[in-house]
């Protein structure tokens, strides 16, 4: 519940930032234009991102005859989650990972890499798939699309401020054009940065929500915790990092269950995933709470 509230608050802050910058830069009319353009830009992303992401990794649908145990696992988890069974895809890449895509539970797909099928045991894989179904159940693709729409509109407004200042369109009631240009440059840099940081924070909060949802769907928080621990250890392997840099598109890293790309402290500010240690700690705490007799 706390992470759900955090998501709502962050979306509110992002919206407030957009309204404030829009009114400051272009007034009501310019603000509406920027929002509409950003909305159309993300319309394609919302409806077709699943096909783009799957094609990007050369993923193919896994038929029931190929892996009946995997289909039965996903079908059981989907029933427990109360959603339709999604299609299952295999991404032929060595980096162990998984992701979900699709705009709603009726148009969803889960993808596993060949690497993750080789690394995890069935209990751990079940935990991972439950996490991905948690994303589907919670409509996280829709939430990220809303955040991207507002963030995109903010970036467009910042660009408008930058070019308007240099073209002299901001001269009305302005006796200090130098200050206007400096202010526009600052806005051009800071506004998109602030919007991006908020979008990343929303993404991190959704990972916590999906972890909890997945743990409850599978009934085994420790299965997911063990999988995350193993995947995180592998992600720090220099050889795997080299493979990830070649196989993983940074633009889709946010979709993965763990961030396959390494980075320093600054990069972590822009990370779409919370620290894996914190995710594991929360799952272990949830496992204790789910034990019979807890709190009595």
Curated annotation (Swiss-Prot):
Positions with a binding annotation for Zn(2+): 131, 135, 207
Stated family: Belongs to the peptidase M48B family.
Statement: the UniProt record of this protein carries the keyword Ribosomal protein: no
GO BP annotations, alphabetical order: proteolysis
UniProt keyword annotations, A-Z: Cell inner membrane, Cell membrane, Hydrolase, Membrane, Metal-binding, Metalloprotease, Protease, Transmembrane, Transmembrane helix, Zinc
Compartments, as annotated in UniProt: Cell inner membrane
Transmembrane segments: 7-27, 29-49, 141-161, 178-198
InterPro entries to which the protein is assigned, alphabetical: HtpX_protease (IPR050083), Pept_M48_protease_HtpX (IPR022919), Peptidase_M48 (IPR001915)
Membrane-topology annotation of the record: Multi-pass membrane protein
Source organism (scientific name): Sulfurihydrogenibium sp. (strain YO3AOP1)
EC number(s) reported in the record: 3.4.24.-
Main localization category: membrane
Reported cofactor(s): Zn(2+)
UniProt-annotated catalytic positions: 132
GO terms for MF: metalloendopeptidase activity; zinc ion binding
Protein name: Protease HtpX homolog
Top-rank lineage group of the source organism: Bacteria
């Amino acid at each position: 519940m706390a992470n759900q509230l955090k998501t709502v608050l962050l979306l509110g802050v992002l919206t407030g930032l957009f309204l404030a910058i829009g009114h400051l830069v272009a007034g009501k009319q310019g603000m509406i234009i920027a929002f509409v353009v950003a909305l159309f830009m993300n319309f394609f992303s919302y409806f077709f991102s699943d096909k783009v992401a799957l094609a990007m990794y050369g993923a193919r649908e896994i038929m029931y005859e190929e892996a009946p145990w995997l289909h039965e696992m996903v079908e059981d988890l989907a029933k427990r989650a109360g959603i339709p069974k999604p299609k299952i895809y295999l991404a032929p890449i060595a980096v162990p990972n998984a992701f979900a895509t699709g705009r709603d539970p009726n148009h969803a797909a889960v993808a596993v890499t060949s690497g993750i099928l080789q690394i995890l045991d069935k209990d751990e894989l079940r935990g991972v798939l439950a996490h991905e179904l948690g994303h589907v159940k919670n409509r996280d693709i829709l939430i990220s699309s809303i955040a991207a729409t507002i963030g995109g509109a903010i970036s467009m407004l910042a660009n408008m401020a930058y070019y308007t200042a240099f073209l002299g369109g901001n001269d009305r009631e302005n006796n200090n054009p130098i200050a206007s240009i400096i202010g526009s440059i600052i806005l051009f840099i800071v506004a998109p940065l602030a919007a991006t940081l908020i979008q990343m924070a929303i993404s991190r909060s959704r990972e916590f929500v999906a972890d909890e949802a997945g743990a409850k769907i599978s009934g085994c928080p420790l299965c997911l915790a063990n999988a995350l621990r193993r995947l995180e250890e592998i992600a720090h392997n220099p050889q795997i990092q080299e493979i990830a840099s070649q196989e993983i598109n940074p633009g889709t890293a946010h979709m993965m269950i763990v961030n396959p790309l390494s980075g320093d402290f600054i990069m972590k500010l822009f990370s779409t995933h919370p620290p894996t240690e914190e995710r594991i700690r929360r799952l272990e705490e949830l496992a204790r709470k789910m034990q019979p007799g807890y709190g009595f």
